[in-house]
Amino acid sequence: MEFSVESLETPALTKAHLAELLFEQIGLNKRESKEMIDAFFELISDRLVEGKDVKISGFGNFQIRTKAPRPGRNPRTGEAIPIESRRVVTFHASHKLKEQIQGSALLGLKTANIFAEDNGPVT
């Protein structure tokens, strides 16, 4: 399944875009597509709220991390304010995704270099 970001109205991929892709490329009706996308993200959210990791092969891992309490400071007044401990979600991209991102970045760099050689420096 392949699509380009250029075909999107905004460069961000949204749940609505994902549902539209299921509708167009898999053949689900629009209601089923939306329900499937919503169920997918609800499942991920539920696991994270439970404090469990979410591992998506070839994409990456979502993990819950507890940040320790620490001293903070109000930037306007300089007053010391304690920051309480909290849970945060972290994402670590898989090696495969990192390689794909680096490959596309290198491809873009090579293209820019080709244009720079033909037309002078790229500014």
UniProtKB/Swiss-Prot annotation:
Keyword Transcription: yes
CDD domains given in the database record: IHF_A (cd13835)
One biological process term in Gene Ontology: regulation of DNA-templated transcription
Classification via InterPro entries: Hist_DNA-bd, Histone-like_DNA-bd_CS, IHF-like_DNA-bd_dom_sf, IHF_alpha
PROSITE patterns to which the protein is assigned, alphabetical: HISTONE_LIKE
Pfam family, one: Bac_DNA_binding
GO cellular component, as recorded: cytosol
GO-annotated molecular function: DNA binding; structural constituent of chromatin
Keyword terms of this UniProt record: DNA recombination, DNA-binding, Transcription, Transcription regulation, Translation regulation
Stated family: Belongs to the bacterial histone-like protein family.
Function: This protein is one of the two subunits of integration host factor, a specific DNA-binding protein that functions in genetic recombination as well as in transcriptional and translational control.
Subunit structure: Heterodimer of an alpha and a beta chain.
Protein name in the entry: Integration host factor subunit alpha
Gene it is expressed from: ihfA
